[in-house]
Every structure is written in C-alpha cells, then in structure tokens.
Amino acid sequence: MISAKMVKDLREKTGAGMMDCKKALTECDGDLEKAVEVLREKGLAAAAKKSGRVAAEGIVSTYISEDMKNGSIIEFNCETDFVSVNELFVELANNLSKQAAFSNVSTAEELLEEKYIADESKLVKDVITELIAKLGENMNLRRIAKLSVDKGVITSYIHGGGRIGVIVKLACEKEDAKLAEIAKDVAMQVAATNPLFLNRDGVDTDTLEKEKEIYRVQALNEGKPEKVVEKMVMGRINKYYKENCLVEQLWVKNGDYTITKYLQEQSKEIGADITVEAFVRYEKGEGIEKKEEDFAEEVQRQMNQGK
C-alpha cells in the first residue's frame, strides 16, 4: 500500500510530480531509493528540478487553417536561444499551436491537460516534461489565443524567427483572394507598431482618465493657463489614439495612409467593406523578469552542479 507520506517523501527528495512519484513507488513496491532511481532514469526528477528555473526565451508560433477561417497563436518558452531553435522544440511548439486552433480550450493550462495531437497516448504536459528531460532546460507553455471568422480571413505574421507573432481577423462579406494579402499587411503593421487597442472603443475608461491626468499635469507644469489646458489635453489624447489604436495608425508601408484609409481603398477595389475585427500580438518573454547572472558565476555554478 502506497501511503500519502511515501509520496510526499519521494516528491520532496526528487521534486517530481505527485502522480509520477506514486507510479514510481508502485512500480518499486514502495522502495523509496529504487523509486528515486526510476524517476532519475525517466528524467522526471531532473525535469522537475529544472522547472524552477526562469524560461524567458523560446518562440511564438501560429497556425492558420487551410480555409483561413481559424487561427491560433502560442508562446512556448525555454531558457536559452540555443534550445529555442532546436528542431524538437520548434516541432513541439508548432504542434501545440495547431492543437490550440482546433481545441475547445481557451487557456494554456487547459491545453496542457489535453491529449497530445501527435501522440494521443500522452498528455501535452507529459510531452513537455519529456522534452525538458531530453534537452535539459525548463520549458513552459505560457499562453494561447484563438480567432475565428465566418466571412473573411484569419492570417498570421511571424517576425524574427518567432520573436514576435501576430494573428489578425479580417471581416468581409465578399470572398476574395486579395483578402489574405491585405490581412498580412495588417498583421505586419501590428508586429511593427505594437498597438495597444484596435480602435477608440477598446480604450478602457481607467486608461483614458489616467492619460488625461498625466497630460493635464504636464500642461500645468509647463505654465499653461487653466483655460487652454483642456484643449491641450484633448489634443494629446487624440495623439495617443493615433499612436495606440491600430485603425488610426499611419501605415508603415505608406505614411500617407492610416490603416483605416488603406482598408477603405482596398474595400473599393474588392467591392465590399473590409474591417479589422481583432488581433493578437505576442512577443516572446515580454513581462518575464529574467535574472541577469555574471558569466563567470554561471560557469562556476554549472561546474558545481556537475560535481
């Protein structure tokens, strides 16, 4: 009989997952030391220890269905740029983005509990654990997002070998081959300019009031009279919209056009209105605090681990 205390002791000794510890103990008839060896042989003990390390490298991967009606984007992290270009790591990332596109789940946590698309005998989380053990680095499926459309297209753009990824939803009542090209232009715009919002309606009240207060204080600090401060604030808010709302931004390919004007021109050519309904932009490692270590200290640490 495998007790909870036995599982707890093995988990504390190896850092492996609870179910992995229970399986190992069952396999070894409750022998703690043999169970430790089993976990080490499977690479699970080492993988669990690595899971405490910061994974801020990696890639952003996207998947678009053949009919361009469904798309997904994921961020899959590892510790070094060396592993981020490893064939096994990239293959897993691409499979995960494909799985996300056709799955009913909406979060990375839910996707981890699903059967793996390329081998349904395993869960996604277990496949990742196996690769951690094989490549010797912590990995983390950080986030996923999906878009779908009935009339229009979904497309993606990857920049810098997976450093930045974007998926865009373009709506149009008329099916036209040129829609894919237009959507790609918009996706490239999102990658280049990193807009915070789709349009003015997407700017929440708290953000808007915060920006207004900042501009108001700036204007007063410049010694402007109270009566002109409000006009200055509104002028700066309009500038904020133009910089941070996708449809109001100047098009990076032609600064004479805003994205709205570009879409209007393309709508005339196609003979139907084209609108951007949504976008998702991921940049690998954004928001992750990565510990900076002295190179000599890092080498010494690795040498000590090898003793």
UniProtKB/Swiss-Prot annotation:
Protein name, entry field: Elongation factor Ts
Where would you find this protein in the cell?
Cytoplasm
Provide the residue span(s) of the region labelled Involved in Mg(2+) ion dislocation from EF-Tu.
Answer: 80-83
**What function does this protein fulfil?**
Associates with the EF-Tu.GDP complex and induces the exchange of GDP to GTP. It remains bound to the aminoacyl-tRNA.EF-Tu.GTP complex up to the GTP hydrolysis stage on the ribosome.
Listed InterPro entries:
EF-Ts_dimer_sf (IPR036402), Transl_elong_EFTs/EF1B (IPR001816), Transl_elong_EFTs/EF1B_dimer (IPR014039), Transl_elong_Ts_CS (IPR018101), UBA-like_sf (IPR009060)
Report the Pfam families cross-referenced here. EF_TS
Q: What is any one of the record's Gene Ontology cellular component terms?
A: cytoplasm
PANTHER family, sorted: ELONGATION FACTOR TS, ELONGATION FACTOR TS, MITOCHONDRIAL
- Alphabetic keyword roster: Cytoplasm, Elongation factor, Protein biosynthesis
**Disulfide-linked positions:** none
Kindly list the GO molecular function terms attached to this UniProt entry. Answer: translation elongation factor activity
- Name the family the entry cites: Belongs to the EF-Ts family.
Q: Using the UniProt record, give the first listed, main subcellular location.
A: cytoplasm
